[in-house]
Amino acid sequence: MSQLLGVAVLGAGHMGADHIRRLDSVVSGARVAAVADPAKERAEEAVAGLDGVLVHTEVAAALDAPGVEAVLIASPGPAHEEALLAAFARGLPVLCEKPMVPDSAGALRIVEAEARLGRRLAQVGFMRRYDAEYMGLKSLLDSGRLGRPLMLHCTHRNVSSPPGFTSAMLINSSVSHEIDAARWLLGQELTAVTVLRPRPSAHAPEGLLDPQFVLFETAGGALVDVEILVNSGFGYQVRCEAVCEAGSVRIGDAHTMVVTSAGGAYQEVAQDYLVRFADAYDREVREWVDATRRGQVTGPSAWDGYAASVVAEAGVRAQDTGDRMTVELAPRPDLYGQNPISR
């Protein structure tokens, strides 16, 4: 392996451009070796000012570019399966943004392909596991100081939804973060989901079922509820409260400034997930680069990506039917160990 890990970045949109900046100026030990995006001009703009970066419009060309030793996938979800399989065929370690693959059948194909390799190559970008507040909550729950977790209360609010955002995407794009966070925090698989749909907000685009209230059941008997509101109009908020047998703990309130002035006080609200979770993204990519340079894969696994896809699909069915839906996972390959919820 070279002195600097050569990374091919697939996708040069909002997320891809942010990762290109991160690899170039924030994370040590890596460099952007190649970028692929169907819109070549967008890729060229994302790497402007960087030396030695090869720009391509095809995934295969970027993966085969000189100096490429690892892959960061930040393209739209439907392109992920092909890119992951191409990386596997070349033996390249991958950090893949969520969703790993949008549908559970495709996600299972990734799990099975990696299992046939007999070694992990893929890490999925569930960045909340790298957020300082979430890491502190995980450590506290694992310590047992508050007793057994009984419930998680989660809040997920966005300023507004982008064009083309559908009611199903509230579950499989937004709540997918809470799906993985709940599995990781509790160390339990989610076994059933119910979705309640209040009257849509006046701020929601016509036809969008926003907000929604999602209730998950877990294998260990805990409950997880999620309020998802993607057209709040005021900011990006993510909160989580764990209610345990001997106490409770809440995160998500303390990451912005509290301003006091004449007549009162107010707290600023982040406007974008890249602002709220900037440090988490930095930590995630830094740890991935360091582990890859050691020949290891340590973060959320392809199994985690598959499980999130299965739960999200059950959530969309519950949203459509109004019924409680159970979650059925395929048998877990031995590659992912006795404790399937990694990191």
Swiss-Prot record:
Record bears the keyword Nuclease: no
GO biological process, one term: inositol catabolic process
Signal peptide from the UniProt entry: none
Alphabetized InterPro entries for the sequence: Gfo-Idh-MocA_inositol_DH, Gfo/Idh/MocA-like_OxRdtase_C, Gfo/Idh/MocA-like_OxRdtase_N, MI/DCI_dehydrogenase, NAD(P)-bd_dom_sf
Main function: Involved in the oxidation of myo-inositol (MI) to 2-keto-myo-inositol (2KMI or 2-inosose).
HAMAP family: IolG
Protein name: Inositol 2-dehydrogenase
